[in-house]
Amino acid sequence: MKSKVNFLKSLIPLFLVTYVCSDSFDNNFYNNHGSVGLINIPTARFFNEEVHGITIYDGTPDQKITLTSNPYDWFEASFFYPNIQGKPYPGFEYQDYKDKGFNLKVRLKKEGQLPAVAIGLNDFAGTGFYSSEYVVTSYGVRNI
């Protein structure tokens, strides 16, 4: 019984750090592309203004480093540089494919009684390997 109590006590700092971090970022997370979203899906949520981040994604077949900036609470811009394994770089037999690109996201409507609405462009200035355009809505239920 004492070992279970000690184990639960050891989890308290973890829960405190999680609470503080999630509260300071309004429950937003970076997705695989380095922008606010869930896994590989963008959301209409944004970090507070003047929040900047660096993300490193190590998946298969691609790895990606992304620099993201939120100069305003309604605008997000990011620059990414991926390495795609198994796809040869043109003219180099033993080199993986490299790319670069930029992402933009702009909020059109803030969340209230209706969902937040944003539009975005992925990889609009690169080779277009990750290219996409989207309109997305997000609505939080009970601050989730």
Model-derived segments and their meaning:
Residues 1-33:
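Cleavable N-terminal export/targeting peptides
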Residues 137:
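Conserved, mostly hydrophobic/aromatic
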Residues 23-132, 140-143:
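Transmembrane beta-barrel domains of Gram-negative outer membranes and organellar outer membranes
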